[in-house]
């Protein structure tokens, strides 16, 4: 795929996109099974005021090569002082379509959607060890706010 991002069609997903969306989600989150992906997709489609997913397709090709999922959050989001916040739950572009501005175009569509819903900021997170994700976030204009390690301790029942 040699097309610049301007040629990619960016649009909000519809229920009819569920199979292609699930395939892209599998590539980003391979640890989740198809039941979990189907449940997440249904939950997002059932709450269009809170969730959105945008997909990118190259010219003349129906199958999407990338997606960005976002959610409007009203809780405390690290590094954001105001609410609501648009949160990037996940962004993925197939390797053959990367470095062409597709992720940027997907996130721009998501940001416009969040702005229309009154979001004060666009936030995201990434594992500490995922340097590629950190680089992508910086390239998309995100500023690092915190580095966090989560802990847990089981409680006896």
Can you name each region flagged by the protein language model?
Residues 8-21:
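A short beta-loop-alpha structural element at the N-terminal edge
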Residues 93, 99-112, 135, 139:
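Conserved acetyl-CoA-binding loop-helix of GNAT-fold acetyltransferases
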Residues 123-133, 152:
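Conserved beta-strand-loop-alpha-helix junction that forms the acyl-donor binding cleft
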Residues 114-126:
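Conserved GNAT acetyl-CoA-binding A-motif
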Residues 55, 63-72, 87, 92:
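Conserved beta-strand in the GNAT
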Residues 119, 138-147:
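Conserved acetyl-CoA-binding loop of GNAT-fold acetyltransferases
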Residues 22-36, 76:
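Helix-loop element at the rim of GNAT/NAT acetyltransferase active sites that forms part
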Residues 32-55, 69:
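Active-site rim helix/loop that mediates acceptor-substrate recognition in acyltransferases
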């Amino acid at each position: 795929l040699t097309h610049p991002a301007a040629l990619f069609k960016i649009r909000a997903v519809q229920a009819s996109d569920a199979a292609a969306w699930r395939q892209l989600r599998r590539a980003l989150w391979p640890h989740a099974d198809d039941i979990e992906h189907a449940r997440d997709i249904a939950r997002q489609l059932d709450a269009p005021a809170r969730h959105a997913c945008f997909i990118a397709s190259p010219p003349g090709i129906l199958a999407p090569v990338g997606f960005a999922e976002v959610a409007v959050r009203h809780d405390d989001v690290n590094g954001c002082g105001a609410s609501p916040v648009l949160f990037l739950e996940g962004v993925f572009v197939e390797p053959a379509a990367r470095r062409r501005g597709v992720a940027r175009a997907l996130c721009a569509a998501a940001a416009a959607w969040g702005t229309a819903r009154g979001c004060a900021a666009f936030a995201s997170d990434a594992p500490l060890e995922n340097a590629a994700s950190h680089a992508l976030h910086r390239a998309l204009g995100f500023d690092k706010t915190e580095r966090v390690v989560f802990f847990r301790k089981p409680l006896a029942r």
